[in-house]
């Protein structure tokens, strides 16, 4: 496909190419797919995005994304409210939910800490986490940050931060490969990592 001179189409391709996992070639294919059946494919996508923009909010408790200020996980009476899993982003929360093996609550950090940069730890929402641990009488905190250098740095920082709370602190099992991110692992691997979690000090 030759480069187009249409700036609007160029912009559409550029926006798609910025999505995770997509390069410029994949972005071109997606744009062409939508434009070839504009009345159905493109309009359906636009309508869905408009609805998502209107309805989706961040859970005021855990940081998940849902249609209510308290997400369906936090509000569910069937979850084990004595356990919290700490994840870096909503992507990792979704990965644990797909495993079907975790029935506790979550706390989404939204970021991680780099061992080489001077990021402010306040970005991790840890005061809110500590408040939840005391208010909800949490018995176990599972640190489910990724097995990257940043994830490990974040895990150690969280452990130090939570020392004043008596909850058991555990880490997902080492079956997750070094440098691995939960969102890219299959459900069986994530499920095993949850089951085989180890105390973390």
Swiss-Prot record:
Key words, A-Z: DNA damage, DNA recombination, DNA repair, Metal-binding, Zinc, Zinc-finger
Top-rank taxon, per record: Bacteria
One example of a Gene Ontology biological process annotation: DNA recombination
Chain intervals annotated as zinc finger (C4-type): 59-74
SS bonds (residue pairs): none
PROSITE patterns (alphabetical): RECR (PS01300), TOPRIM (PS50880)
GO molecular function: DNA binding; zinc ion binding
Keyword Protein transport tagged: no
Domain (Toprim): residue spans on this chain: 82-177
PANTHER family found in the cross-reference section: RECOMBINATION PROTEIN RECR
Function: May play a role in DNA repair. It seems to be involved in an RecBC-independent recombinational process of DNA repair. It may act with RecF and RecO.
Family label: Belongs to the RecR family.
This protein's name: Recombination protein RecR
Provenance organism: Rickettsia conorii (strain ATCC VR-613 / Malish 7)
Gene of this entry: recR
